[in-house]
Amino acid sequence: MTTAIFSKVQVDMGQFYGRVSARILLNVPQRELSYQSFGEKQELKNSIGLVLDETEMQSLLPFLRAELFEPYRDREDMHDEVGYLDESWRMFTGISDSHVPMIRLPMNVIHDLAHRWPTELLYEQIVRVIRARNDRRFRKIAL
């Protein structure tokens, strides 16, 4: 049996809830990773894209397994939280090409190392991939 993975991942970020100021998109089948930033009126201000190589994709795949995210679907309580993102928010959306329905999970809570959600682990790995590229287009972006 093949393990279902997310084929598309989106992480929306903002300072005012509901207004997206930045977005990370991962398209697994196309091996594309992009970052977009938006202005106050939600107009696209900047868009940067990367085509991921085999090593970068392999580093992301363990974090894309849909089964890791299922225990958090519809969860309202936040066990073992440490704190909240200060004056900002993030929202994870994962879509698979299999039987697993789309999942949306908030990323506003900071957990201790023993209780980190898979959304946090995936986000951190995406940031590591971006930073390892040392692409000058990403240098001024706070991820």
Regions found by a protein language model. Name each.
Residues 28-30, 51-60, 94-100:
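A short, structured loop/turn motif at beta-sheet edges
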Residues 21-43:
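Short, flexible N-terminal segments of the mature chain
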Residues 1-17, 48, 63, 70-143:
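Short, well-ordered, aromatic-rich surface patches in folded extracellular/luminal domains
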Residues 27-33, 53, 71, 111-113:
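Short, low-complexity, polar/charged sequence segments that are solvent-exposed and flexible
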Residues 37-73:
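A short-motif feature that recognizes glycine-rich, charge-decorated loops
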